[in-house]
Regions:
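N-terminal ligand-binding/catalytic initiation module
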Residues: 1-158, 353, 397-398, 405, ...
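Glycine-rich phosphate/diphosphate-binding loop of Rossmann-like nucleotide-binding domains
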Residues: 77, 82-102, 154, 160, ...
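A short, aliphatic-rich alpha-helical micro-motif
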Residues: 127, 185, 252-253, 273-276
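ADP-ribose/adenylate-binding Rossmann-like module
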Residues: 134-137, 158-161, 258-313
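Terminal amphipathic helices with adjacent charged low-complexity linkers/tails
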Residues: 146, 154, 223, 387-417, ...
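Adenosine-phosphate binding glycine-rich loop
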Residues: 161-162, 181-183, 286-392, 396-402
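Long, charged amphipathic helices and adjacent flexible linkers at domain junctions
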Residues: 408-436
Length: 470
C-alpha cells in the first residue's frame, strides 16, 4: 500500500468541491413542467398518496435507498473522543463507501451531545426520512444502550457498525480459518482482547457461530474478565465472566486456539504467540496498528493463520465487506430490522465466496497477486464485485425467512441480476449474453485446458450453468 502523507489527505478533501459527497438529481429538471412536477403543484399528489398509505413513501421518495450515518464523535477510529464536528470527515467517508459498494445514498448526521437519551430521541424523530440507521463511532457502553433502545421502537433497520461490522467479517474469517487447520468450532478456546463495542459484539457472535461460552475468555485493560471481579465491570462484561485463575492476557493466551484482538497496538508479545495451541489463529484487528504485527507473529512461529485490519497484509478484516451489502439486502426487502439471522447469513456468504475461484478482474485490481483459498486468503477482497451479489442476496433471503421483510423478493436470481445492473450497462449486457447462452447451450472444447485462464473461464461457465462438464 502506498504511503499516505498528511498533505495528500488534506489536499484530497479540500481540492475542488469540499468534502467527499454531494446530492445528485434523479429526475429531469430542465423545463418549467419538470419543476412543476418536482415541486408545487405536482408534489402534492405523492404527498396525498403517502398520507393515505405511509408505505408509499418507499414508492414516491428516496427513503428506501437512504441511510443515516449518525455519530457523536466519541469513539472515532484511531482518534478517540474528538467530537461531532471533527468526526464529520469519517462520516462522509462512510457515505462514500455505502455509495461505491452498494449504491446506497447517505446523509451524515453529527450530533453534538454526549447524552445517550438525547441521541435516542433525535434518531427516533428521523425515522420518516430514512430507510435505515447506521450508528457510528459512539463510545461503549453507551453505544449498546442506544442501539438496544432504538431497535425496540423503530421499524427500520438500526445497525451499530463498530459492533456488528467487525463481527461479520471476522466471523467469516474464523469459519474458514478453522476449516483450513481442521479444528471444530465447538472445541476451540478463544481469547478476546478488548471489551468495548467490537469486542463484546464479536464474543456474542462467535457464540452464535458455535464457540462454547465456557471456552471464551474476555480480556480488557484491567485483565481477564472473571467471576467476582469488581473493577471496570458493567453488565455487558458480566455476561462473559467465567471461573478461571487466569488474570492477565499472557495467562489467557496459554493453549488458546484463537486470539481476536480489538484493542490497541502491541499488547501481544512473541512469547504469548508461542504459548498458543498448534495451528494458532490470530486476528489482530486493532487500527491503525495491530496488537502484534504479522512479522513478529511469524517470527515467533510459522503455524499461524494471521489477519489484521490493514490492507498491506493478507487477510484484511475490513468492515466495508459488511455494512454496504448488509444494508443493500435489508433495504431491498424493506426490512424492519437487521437481525442475527441476517448477520449470520452475511458471514456464511462471505465464508463460502472465499472458496470460489477469483476472477481475473479482481486479481488485476490487486496487482495480479495470486488469490486462492488458504492461509493467506480466508476472506474475499473488498473490490470483488461478487460480494454484493452473494452477501446482499443472502441477507435479503434471511430477512424473508426470519419474518422481518415487508417486501419479499419472489425471484432471487432476478434480484441478483438487478444488483449487477446497478453498476453499469456493460454488466447488464453480460447478463443478457449469459441468459442467451443458457437458453441455447453449445458444446465447448478448450484445447488449452492446462492454462490457468482457461481453467478459470471453465469454472465461470460451470457456475453460470451455461454448460456442464462431459
Amino acid at each position: 500500500m502506498a504511503m499516505i502523507r498528511k498533505q495528500d489527505a488534506l489536499d484530497y478533501h479540500s481540492t475542488g468541491r469540499k468534502g467527499k459527497i454531494e446530492i445528485a438529481l434523479t429526475k429531469p429538471c430542465a423545463t418549467q413542467r419538470d419543476l412543476s412536477l418536482a415541486y408545487t403543484p405536482g408534489v402534492a399528489e405523492p404527498c396525498r398518496e403517502i398520507y393515505a398509505n405511509p408505505e408509499d413513501a418507499y414508492k414516491y421518495t428516496a427513503k428506501g435507498n437512504l441511510v443515516a450515518v449518525v455519530s457523536n464523535g466519541t469513539a472515532v477510529l484511531g482518534l478517540g473522543d474528538i467530537g461531532a464536528l471533527a468526526g464529520k470527515p469519517v462520516m462522509e467517508g462512510k457515505g462514500v463507501l455505502f455509495k461505491r459498494f452498494a449504491d446506497i445514498d447517505v446523509f451524515d448526521i453529527e450530533l453534538d451531545t454526549h447524552d445517550p437519551d438525547e441521541i435516542i430521541r433525535i434518531v427516533k424523530a428521523l425515522e420518516p426520512t430514512f430507510g435505515g440507521i447506521n450508528l457510528e463511532d459512539i463510545k461503549a457502553p453507551e453505544c449498546f444502550y442506544i442501539e438496544e433502545e432504538l431497535k425496540k421502537t423503530m421499524k427500520i433497520p438500526v445497525f451499530h457498525d463498530d459492533q456488528h461490522g467487525t463481527v461479520i467479517i471476522s466471523g467469516a474469517g474464523l469459519l474458514n480459518a478453522l476449516e483450513i487447520v481442521g479444528k471444530k468450532i465447538d472445541h476451540v478456546k478463544v481469547v478476546f482482547s478488548g471489551a468495548g463495542a467490537a469486542g463484546i459484539a464479536c464474543a456474542k457472535f462467535y457464540i452464535k457461530l458455535g464457540v462454547k461460552r465456557e471456552n471464551l475468555m474476555l480480556v480488557d485493560t484491567k485483565g481477564v474478565v472473571y467471576k467476582g471481579r469488581k473493577e471496570g465491570m458493567n453488565p455487558y462484561k458480566e455476561y462473559f465472566a467465567i471461573d478461571t485463575n487466569a488474570r492477565t492476557l499472557a495467562d489467557a493466551m496459554k493453549g488458546a486456539d484463537v486470539f481476536a484482538g480489538v484493542s490497541v497496538k502491541g499488547v501481544v508479545t512473541k512469547e504469548m504467540v508461542k504459548s498458543m495451541a498448534h495451528d494458532a489463529i490470530i486476528f489482530a484487528m486493532a487500527n491503525p496498528d495491530p496488537e502484534i504485527t504479522p512479522e513478529d507473529a511469524f517470527d515467533a512461529r510459522k503455524d499461524l493463520i494471521m489477519a489484521t485490519g490493514r490492507s498491506d497484509y493478507p487477510n484484511q478484516i475490513n468492515n466495508v465487506l459488511g455494512f454496504p451489502f448488509l444494508f443493500r439486502g435489508a433495504l431491498d426487502v424493506m426490512a424492519t430490522a437487521i437481525n442475527d439471522e441476517m448477520k449470520l447469513a452475511a458471514a456464511y456468504a462471505l465464508s463460502t465466496l472465499a472458496k470460489e475461484d477469483v476472477p481475473d478482474s479482481v486479481l488485476k485490481a490487486y496487482g495480479g497477486v495470486r488469490l486462492k483459498f488458504g492461509r493467506d486468503y480466508i476472506i474475499p477482497k473488498p473490490l470483488d464485485p461478487r460480494v454484493l451479489l452473494w452477501e446482499a442476496t443472502a441477507v435479503a433471503k434471511a430477512a424473508m425467512e426470519s419474518g422481518v421483510a415487508r417486501k419479499p423478493i419472489a425471484d432471487l436470481d432476478a434480484y441478483r441480476d438487478s444488483l449487477e445492473s446497478r453498476f453499469g450497462r456493460s454488466k447488464q449486457i453480460m447478463r443478457v449474453l449469459i441468459h442467451k447462452a443458457r437458453e441455447a447451450p453449445k458444446r465447448i472444447v478448450f484445447p488449452e485446458g492446462q492454462e490457468e485462464k482457461i481453467l478459470r473461464a471453465s469454472q465461470i461457465i460451470l457456475d453460470e450453468e451455461i454448460a456442464m462438464p462431459i
